[in-house]
Amino acid sequence: MERIKELRDLLSQSRTREILTKTTVDHMAIIKKYTSGRQEKNPALRMKWMMAMKYPITADKRIMEMIPERNEQGQTLWSKTNDAGSDRVMVSPLAVTWWNRNGPATSTVHYPKVYKTYFEKVERLKHGTFGPVHFRNQVKIRRRVDINPGHADLSAKEAQDVIMEVVFPNEVGARILTSESQLTITKEKKEELQDCKIAPLMVAYMLERELVRKTRFLPVAGGTSSVYIEVLHLTQGTCWEQMYTPGGEVRNDDVDQSLIIAARNIVRRATVSADPLASLLEMCHSTQIGGIRMVDILRQNPTEEQAVDICKAAMGLRISSSFSFGGFTFKRTSGSSVKREEEVLTGNLQTLKIRVHEGYEEFTMVGRRATAILRKATRRLIQLIVSGRDEQSIAEAIIVAMVFSQEDCMIKAVRGDLNFVNRANQRLNPMHQLLRHFQKDAKVLFQNWGIEPIDNVMGMIGILPDMTPSTEMSLRGLRVSKMGVDEYSSTERVVVSIDRFLRVRDQRGNVLLSPEEVSETQGTEKLTITYSSSMMWEINGPESVLVNTYQWIIRNWETVKIQWSQDPTMLYNKMEFEPFQSLVPKAARGQYSGFVRTLFQQMRDVLGTFDTVQIIKLLPFAAAPPEQSRMQFSSLTVNVRGSGMRILVRGNSPVFNYNKATKRLTVLGKDAGALTEDPDEGTAGVESAVLRGFLILGKEDKRYGPALSINELSNLAKGEKANVLIGQGDVVLVMKRKRDSSILTDSQTATKRIRMAIN
């Protein structure tokens, strides 16, 4: 009671009431907020208030020796009074100006190196061109984009190791630099940043920008490569867009673009080979993009594209759990289904066996130019809300959704037979048969689908069978929306399996990807793609096949010539000769092969007829299955430059020209390499006699110890190998025969073998 009385007295005084009602400081919380803690609550105000003072800055005492007390205008730069509560001097903002003008100059050589990403950004903007601003509705969809142009693709852990090694080389802690890119970057940066005076922490931050890909999930309406994303705030608003052409490209965008092209080429090529999966892996492992191994890029690069994901799956890497159909990425957002085989009849009474999804499901569909939300039940489309850049793009999305729905009216809309095949001439599966059919012509599909009256819903309109918009009617279940559908934001990756035919499945057995989904779009890669695999020789046409085949023989001549004399069949079956067969006229392949093989056999049988140039020239022709015939040829035809060109069996031609003087071979005028020809047959009698019972394998091999003299050979066990010194101080590798019956032929072939092994 006492307290209340006291309060009432206080409030009766008008001043008290005024303070408590009209000022904002009537809350203990507010007073606390501005007075407790070390965190500055209003930095801008504090800064203004501080800078209004004469000496707002404190500095170490040493500053008094480094800066004069007054500047040229006679203004005081520092005060003799100490800063209250610290051992520092009070300094005027004018001192900063003096220091900037007259202080010691440091070397600026490291700035462009450390702040490389910023310097490059300025250059790109300087040379970029900004076009007109257009006002229109922006269909933006959120996509995961790269926000950091000009970076390498290291993982966070790899980058951390590189940064520690470059910036803090003497710090303790295990750092393992394993990948090629890690080692290269570390070496390069250590050299660049020698004697760098910039704060190590700053250097570390900047290195991180250069090494690691940073992605954000942002609303985008145009280009998604990082040089567009860095100016996103300048190029698109809610209702406007500004045209922009970047003033430079960055390697990370080029890598992404070139990776997609390489992956597409490899998947397309693998599809038509006998064992697609093995071929795909062989090509991925032997391909380089911009000088970096493709498999290293695949491990680090998060690009999601059908062909890239097939390559990743083949390498055992995890990929996104969404699946691809008709070039759209489908992600199930709710519902579930079970799969059941069902036979259906097309409008042409052709029977198709399709895997029906039974159950209610909702999907988002995201394509390059259109997006949609799809709700479906068993073989029934309930609703499709689609948005896209133009009529054409919207139509593409509608066709894919209609086929995916597996509705009966879609299957009945098929006119004519379905017999689409893939690159390897295998029939496509029924769902892709239907898709190809309607992608060619969807008129009947749209006419038979059915239309319905529509309600007026904000932001939605109807679409008619001829793909024109309408506010009254629409194709059954279909609406066109102004708003795009966001891409699936999660970066979650799942374990998948891949079969021989490159079909990728998740762990439940759902097909996520197949070669049919790989785009046929051709593009020109920004970075050089080097396919070392012979399977990719034909990508640049017949001439490239011809040159590459002969270059391969010359590069591998050492092993080729030993196989030529010992195991020709294995040599003829080498995959490197496969592309060459497409150049040889079909009718002549077998005859040429039979003729060349017979010729080679004669060379092997008759001493002294070994002719390196001729073997190299004719070898690719021997790879086809031979036909036994008595035919002789003086020239063999290959189809290049749009016509048949001749290779002379004995002698030079424009296709195959060996210059004895320079010992170089040119194929179609392109240099194919240098040849070391065999010397003339000398006296080889002695060695061949002594080397009976031994097989000559080739050049000396250090793993088998020092060279033995011919007398020491008798101690070898059957099948044992050794280096042996022969004739004029040459060393060859030999193996003691396992059977005695073959000894007779040894002395004949030994002469030739020694001669080949020495060269």
Swiss-Prot record:
UniProt signal peptide: none
* Keyword Phosphoprotein in annotation: no
A cellular component term, taken from the record's GO annotations? virion component
Q: Which GO molecular function terms does the record list? A: RNA binding; RNA-directed RNA polymerase activity
> Which parts of the chain are coiled coil?
none
Single biological process term from Gene Ontology = DNA-templated transcription
Record-marked site positions (Avian adaptation): 627
Keywords in UniProt for this one?
Cap snatching, Eukaryotic host gene expression shutoff by virus, Eukaryotic host transcription shutoff by virus, Host gene expression shutoff by virus, Host nucleus, Host-virus interaction, Inhibition of host RNA polymerase II by virus, mRNA capping, mRNA processing, Viral transcription, Virion
Q: Where is this motif: Nuclear localization signal?
A: 736-739
Can you say where in the cell this protein is located? Virion; Host nucleus
Q: Chief location of this protein?
A: virion
A Pfam short name = Flu_PB2_1st
Q: Does the keyword Lipid biosynthesis apply?
A: no
InterPro entries under this entry? Flu_PB2_2nd (IPR049110), Flu_PB2_6th (IPR049114), Flu_PB2_C (IPR049115), Flu_PB2_CAP-bd (IPR048298), Flu_PB2_middle (IPR049111), Flu_PB2_N (IPR049106), INV_PB2 (IPR001591), PB2_helical (IPR049113)
* Oligomeric form and interacting partners: Influenza RNA polymerase is composed of three subunits: PB1, PB2 and PA. Interacts (via N-terminus) with PB1 (via C-terminus). Interacts with nucleoprotein NP (via N-terminus).
As for what it does, the entry says: Plays an essential role in transcription initiation and cap-stealing mechanism, in which cellular capped pre-mRNAs are used to generate primers for viral transcription. Recognizes and binds the 7-methylguanosine-containing cap of the target pre-RNA which is subsequently cleaved after 10-13 nucleotides by the viral protein PA. Plays a role in the initiation of the viral genome replication and modulates the activity of the ribonucleoprotein (RNP) complex.
Q: Which family does it belong to?
A: Belongs to the influenza viruses PB2 family.
Designated name of the protein: Polymerase basic protein 2
Species for this entry: Influenza A virus (strain A/Ruddy Turnstone/New Jersey/47/1985 H4N6)
